[in-house]
Amino acid sequence: MPKNRFERMMFALLTVVVTVHAYVFYSLYVVNGPTLMAVTGASSVLGDIRAQGGVYMLGRMVPIWGVVLAEFLCAYGLEVLMGSPCSFRLASKVFSPADTHPVLFETAIICATVGLMCPAMSFLAAVLYYPYYHGFHLVTLLANWLKLVCFNFPFAYFTQLFFIQPLIRTLFKALFRRVPQTV
C-alpha cells in the first residue's frame, strides 16, 4: 500500500475519482431522482437534468460535469487533509499495524474513513444543494444534513468496503509494483 506522500496522494486521487462519480449518480438517482422527475414530469432522471438545464447547486443550475468537478475538489481536499490521516490514526488506536493482519487493519481504516468522510461530505452536499430559493434556515440545513447522512452512510460503507477499496487497491498495486527485496 502507499509508502510515501506521493503514493498516498495518488491513492487518494484514485479513490476520489471512483467515489465521487458513484456518489453523485447515487445521489441524483436514488436520493433525489423521484423528486427531480416530479418537478418536470420527465420519464428519467437524465431527461429531467436536461430539461432543467443542469443540477441545482448553490442557488443556480450547474451542468453535471460542474457538479462532479465541485464534489471532486471538495472530496479530494477532505480526503488528503482529514480522511486518510485521521482514519489511519483511529485504526491505529484500536489495532497495532505491526501485530494485526493487514486485511483486518485495512478494513479498520476503511470503516474509519467512511465514519469521517460520510458526515463531512454529506454536510458539504447539504450546503451545496440547499434550497436557497426558500431562504436560509439553519434547522433546515441540519435536517438536510442528517437526511443525507442516513441515505449515504449505508451506501458509503458497503461500496467502500466491498467494491471501491478492493478495486482501488488492485489498481494501485498494478500501478505501483514493488520489486521484492532479496537479502
Question: How would you label these PLM feature ranges?
Answer:
Residues M1-V183:
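Juxtamembrane/disordered regions of integral membrane proteins
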